[in-house]
Amino acid sequence: LKTDCTHLLFLDSDIRWKTPEILRMLAFVEEAPVLCGVYPKKEINWAAVHAAVMRGVPADQLKHHTATMVVNLIGYQGAVAVPGDRPAEVLNAGTGCMLIARHVLAAMAPHVDTYVTDTMPIGGGTIQNGEVILEFFKTSIDPETRHLLSEDYHFCHVWRSLGGKIHVAPWVALGHFGSYLFEGEFLKDT
């Protein structure tokens, strides 16, 4: 909030993405001010691979059925119907690809913890010693479920507790670099 930027975009360095898909996210910022691309965890979901084999998925297509995606759905009951060209509401998603409108951060600011820095910047850093930092992203425990919330899920939890919504962009196809390129498709793997 120290600048006049209108959005904050997280794109992790280990995420493979396509520019047109990311730019398209901006078209939905009014209806979906927190909009995420869904990407696979760095693991192979062997149960999903087995299920795909049993359904007769060709060997050259199995890589699209290996993923456990970094997203949690609202009221998931085993079947997902998401329009592929519109944002879809979810419980939470990862910051590996997350677009946040400035007004979201401004609305959250009075409701997040703060701390004061105690380090001196080296090399002309922008954060000064003694500056108050807003802690939008931290780990926490969900008071209802007692689940551990990672930094990205904590952010989503706080925004939802203030009446906001988290959306995903199903048209964004992301890969996650690890020991190899983990791939998956949100509509197929959830």
Predicted regions and their residues:
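Short, Asp-centered acidic motifs that coordinate Mg2+ and/or phosphate
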Residues: 7, 32-34, 166
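Short beta-strand-to-loop acidic/aromatic patch adjacent to the donor-nucleotide binding site
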Residues: 5-16
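C-terminal catalytic/acceptor-binding lobe
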Residues: 110-190
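Active-site charged/polar residues at nucleotide-handling catalytic sites that mediate phosphoryl
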Residues: 3-4, 30
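Conserved catalytic core of nucleotide-sugar-dependent glycosyltransferases
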Residues: 18-138
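Short, conserved alpha-helix that lines the donor NDP-sugar binding/gating region
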Residues: 1-2, 157
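Active-site-proximal beta-strand/loop segments in catalytic clefts of secreted hydrolases
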Residues: 11-13, 38-40, 171
